[in-house]
Amino acid sequence: MNHQYIPSPIYSDQNSGVHNVNKSLHNLNINNGNNNYNYSNNNYNNNINNNNNINNNINNNNNNNNNNNNNNINQYHQNHYDQYSDNNCNNSNSNNINNNNNINNNINNNNINNNNNNINSNNNNNNNNNNNNNNNLLKIPQLNISPNGVGGGNGISNGNGVNKIFSKLDLSKVPNSYQLAHNSSMPNSPTSSNISPSTPTSMALNLSSLKSILDSPPAAPAHSASSSHNNDHRTLNINGNHHNNNNNINNNINNNVNNNINNGNGNGNGNGNNNNNNNIGVNGSGSSNSSSPSIGFSIPLLQLKQIGINNQTSPSQQSQQQQQQQQQQQQSQHNGIPLINTTEIHQRSNPSSATNSPRALYYGNESSVENSPFTTPLSSPRGPISPRATINSSMSNLQSNIRVEEQWKKIEYYVNDLSHFIYESIRNKDYSNLSELKEKIDEVVNTSKEIEIIHSIAKSLPPQTRARKKRSTKAEKLQKDLIGIKRSYVTTPKSKGTYCIFCGTMETPEWRKGPGGHKTLCNACGLHYAKNIKKENQNNGGSPNPQQNNVTTTTTTTTSTSTNSPNSNGNNFSPESAMSVSKLISD
């Protein structure tokens, strides 16, 4: 069978004999359900050929045809993915990729050297007597410890359930400014001092082992001797069987100084004989087939270190703590990691540090805000208005009001002085000065008595305003109106014999000219008479009324006749003249 060389980011350096991984490798996703090896990188510029690099060379010279299992190793390319395809890739008797999804790779002598960041992986199999196994080597990227650290995941492990890839990771060379990832489903894991190749290396640390890690000096960040970029951030995301097990664990390996150890959403299964779980990561043993992800949170260790027995922090430490907290919040928002604000925990755990005032010590920790006794509130709740306040509001004496206001200001001063004296006595814990206390209380009492005296004097004073005028009744109003009307009339005594020739009234404001001459008609009748004469003159075109002429003639005759008679009255008219005048007035 011809060898098929697959372009891959995994390569082997022939000169050094050390298997290195492309610096741009970011994500290694092993999907156990589909047996897909997904390699995600940014730049694949390595031309892998037979002469220069040996890229996961699967030698099939001594393959057993009975072990053909038709497994497809597909590497696909979408945006940042390249697709690899190799059908019927069967190794010799040692490495079997079978339908049970078991990848049993015994990887021994895994030394992680922080000086050159090279991982020497020698794949030695006891069941393999063929030299072709040297061509099928699992290439692991150089582990530059990152803020997210090395966490548990689903991937490749040996058949005994122990992952030996990261088993010799020395945590003493990892800077101690990382985040602790806590998962309720993870047991108490060993510290950096007792990690051995036979121990499952669960990187979740318990709180009892923090002190030994925090007290150790931070080591310098690892730098690769073969890397040309010191700040090259490389990330290895190892995801387990996402479709079957729902346990996704992201192991972010970067080159930052602040290194975080993160546990993701569950623990992988390190049993090599399990059909659904093939582990690459820290958790090399155990089984987690639960479909519900566990809830994880991270606590900054630098803040936990500052929480001592006495919980006392200086202002400089508080400022550094706030800066570190802001940086960690920004980093957690970038990585999607929830953080716990330990500043609030510190304040809650030390309530006595909130205030050290004597009032708080005397009354208890009720409030950390102290109000000065000299500050008067703008508005204070008032009770019901007393009758005395009602009398004071109705009092119109301006001078007494001014005196009352002065007394109230005086009593306000005395009360504030008394409260200040009590406050200082409690703060200084001096409770023996009773004479001064009594003196200040007497000042307040005497001022209140003066205010009462002023109120009593103001009440006894007569009002300075006039009494309100009494309202007259309706009958009185009518009588006053009648009196006023009568006074406006001009009365004429009946002895004179003057009266209106039309209505017969003897009282009128003014006598008017009528057909009998001057002052023969009352005011009302004279107005009607003059108005009707004007209308008749207008209707007749300016010619005099014949009736008027007749009336005038008759009046003249009667007057001349009456003048001759001794018993005649000047105001006596004939019936005809009276009818004519009444007709004019009535019209």
UniProtKB/Swiss-Prot annotation:
<dbReference type="GO" id="GO:0006357">
    <property type="term" value="P:regulation of transcription by RNA polymerase II"/>
</dbReference>
<feature type="compositionally biased region" description="Low complexity">
    <location>
        <begin position="53"/>
        <end position="74"/>
    </location>
</feature>
<feature type="compositionally biased region" description="Low complexity">
    <location>
        <begin position="538"/>
        <end position="575"/>
    </location>
</feature>
<dbReference type="GO" id="GO:0008270">
    <property type="term" value="F:zinc ion binding"/>
</dbReference>
<dbReference type="GO" id="GO:0140582">
    <property type="term" value="P:adenylate cyclase-activating G protein-coupled cAMP receptor signaling pathway"/>
</dbReference>
<keyword id="KW-0479">Metal-binding</keyword>
<dbReference type="GO" id="GO:0005634">
    <property type="term" value="C:nucleus"/>
</dbReference>
<feature type="compositionally biased region" description="Low complexity">
    <location>
        <begin position="183"/>
        <end position="202"/>
    </location>
</feature>
<feature type="compositionally biased region" description="Polar residues">
    <location>
        <begin position="75"/>
        <end position="86"/>
    </location>
</feature>
<feature type="region of interest" description="Disordered">
    <location>
        <begin position="53"/>
        <end position="141"/>
    </location>
</feature>
<dbReference type="GO" id="GO:0005737">
    <property type="term" value="C:cytoplasm"/>
</dbReference>
<dbReference type="GO" id="GO:0043326">
    <property type="term" value="P:chemotaxis to folate"/>
</dbReference>
<dbReference type="GO" id="GO:0031149">
    <property type="term" value="P:sorocarp stalk cell differentiation"/>
</dbReference>
<dbReference type="InterPro" id="IPR051140">
    <property type="entry name" value="GATA_TF"/>
</dbReference>
<feature type="region of interest" description="Disordered">
    <location>
        <begin position="536"/>
        <end position="587"/>
    </location>
</feature>
<feature type="compositionally biased region" description="Polar residues">
    <location>
        <begin position="340"/>
        <end position="358"/>
    </location>
</feature>
<dbReference type="InterPro" id="IPR013088">
    <property type="entry name" value="Znf_NHR/GATA"/>
</dbReference>
<protein>
    <recommendedName>
        <fullName>GATA zinc finger domain-containing protein 3</fullName>
    </recommendedName>
</protein>
<feature type="compositionally biased region" description="Polar residues">
    <location>
        <begin position="365"/>
        <end position="379"/>
    </location>
</feature>
<feature type="region of interest" description="Disordered">
    <location>
        <begin position="312"/>
        <end position="392"/>
    </location>
</feature>
<feature type="compositionally biased region" description="Low complexity">
    <location>
        <begin position="316"/>
        <end position="333"/>
    </location>
</feature>
<feature type="region of interest" description="Disordered">
    <location>
        <begin position="179"/>
        <end position="294"/>
    </location>
</feature>
<dbReference type="Pfam" id="PF00320">
    <property type="entry name" value="GATA"/>
</dbReference>
<dbReference type="GO" id="GO:0000976">
    <property type="term" value="F:transcription cis-regulatory region binding"/>
</dbReference>
<dbReference type="InterPro" id="IPR000679">
    <property type="entry name" value="Znf_GATA"/>
</dbReference>
<dbReference type="GO" id="GO:0006351">
    <property type="term" value="P:DNA-templated transcription"/>
</dbReference>
<feature type="compositionally biased region" description="Low complexity">
    <location>
        <begin position="87"/>
        <end position="136"/>
    </location>
</feature>
<feature type="compositionally biased region" description="Low complexity">
    <location>
        <begin position="237"/>
        <end position="264"/>
    </location>
</feature>
<feature type="compositionally biased region" description="Low complexity">
    <location>
        <begin position="272"/>
        <end position="292"/>
    </location>
</feature>
<dbReference type="GO" id="GO:0003700">
    <property type="term" value="F:DNA-binding transcription factor activity"/>
</dbReference>
<keyword id="KW-0862">Zinc</keyword>
<keyword id="KW-0863">Zinc-finger</keyword>
<feature type="compositionally biased region" description="Polar residues">
    <location>
        <begin position="577"/>
        <end position="587"/>
    </location>
</feature>
<dbReference type="GO" id="GO:0031152">
    <property type="term" value="P:aggregation involved in sorocarp development"/>
</dbReference>
<dbReference type="GO" id="GO:0060176">
    <property type="term" value="P:regulation of aggregation involved in sorocarp development"/>
</dbReference>
<feature type="zinc finger region" description="GATA-type">
    <location>
        <begin position="500"/>
        <end position="525"/>
    </location>
</feature>
